[in-house]
Design a protein with these regions (language model features):
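Cleavable N-terminal signal peptides
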Residues: 8-11, 20-21
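Extracytoplasmic
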Residues: 24, 53-55, 64-67, 74, ...
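A structural signal for short loop-to-beta-strand junctions that line the ligand-binding cleft
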Residues: 98-110, 238-239
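Bilobed "Venus flytrap"/periplasmic-binding protein-like clamshell domains
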Residues: 24-57, 113-184
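Pocket-lining segment of extracytoplasmic ligand-binding domains
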Residues: 84, 94-95, 123, 159-239
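N-terminal signal peptide c-region/cleavage motif recognized by signal peptidases
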Residues: 16-18
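Bacterial N-terminal signal peptides that target proteins for export
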Residues: 1-8
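Pocket-flanking alpha-helical
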Residues: 43-47, 59-99, 176-181, 196-205, ...
Length: 239
């Protein structure tokens, strides 16, 4: 699979937890969307816990980086997948969080994830400056990838409402639905904060063919500075 190496934003995937289950207790995990890497990994983690800890039953349901912090804090789950900067914002009530969520704790740091932005190989879109009237699919509300997108286009001087006013569409849907929209030509851009490589992008590379959108150094320098927790990264050409 050919990929252009370009500047991207990455963050560490980690698990956050509230109180851990005791014996004869049900342990609930909120992970990621179907089609992403978090959901199958979350299912495996829960399987291992259930077989290794006597008296514990488990479940794994889909979620998003922002909503998972809220679910754990609110007692709807005991363990949730998120990103380092997302849970830090949630704990302190910053960013997309309207209040502080103090009933969360770090449980484990797993691996870095990249915010990836792809267009069809024949697209005229060369950068974020060309997306002001595009049909984009950045993820669902309360997903960290959606927040990534908003922070980037904010630096370019527009937002989701601007896109809509200009005749574009913001599809807030799942990875699976985003892939279908890209294949049908109903979405011009697919964005996701996920592992590298990732199944949805591999599927789109096979058909209809895609290329990735990066950020110029001066732009990414400013975005990283303005968003604590963001770090630099590149998609390897061999990925």
């Amino acid at each position: 699979m050919k990929r252009i190496s370009g500047a991207i934003l990455i963050a560490s995937s980690l698990l956050v937890t509230s109180s851990i289950a005791n014996a004869d207790q049900f342990l609930r995990m909120v992970s990621g969307p179907s089609g992403g890497s978090w959901y199958p990994l979350g299912a495996k983690v829960m399987q291992v816990m259930e077989t290794s800890i006597k008296g514990v039953s488990t479940s794994n349901t889909s979620g998003g980086g922002i909503s998972n912090v809220m679910s754990v804090d609110g007692g709807d789950a005991e363990i949730g997948w998120t990103y380092a900067h997302t849970v830090a914002n949630g704990y302190s009530g910053k960013g997309k969080f309207k209040k502080a969520h103090k009933n969360v704790r770090y449980f484990a740091t797993l691996y870095p994830a990249a915010f990836q932005v792809a267009v069809r190989a024949d697209s005229k879109i060369k950068g974020f400056e060309d997306m002001k009237s595009a049909n984009i699919s950045p993820g669902k509300p309360k997903w960290t990838g959606t927040a990534f997108c908003e922070s980037i286009i904010k630096d370019y001087g527009y937002d989701f409402n601007t896109i809509k006013k200009n005749g574009g569409v913001v599809h807030m849907v799942s990875y699976k639905e985003s892939v279908a929209l890209m294949k049908d030509g109903q979405a011009d851009v697919f964005m996701a904060a996920t592992s590298v490589p990732q199944a949805s992008f591999i599927e789109l590379e096979n058909s209809p063919g895609i290329r990735f959108i990066g950020l110029p150094k001066d732009r990414i320098d400013r975005i990283v500075k303005n968003n604590p927790g963001y770090i630099y990264g590149k998609i390897p050409a061999s990925a």
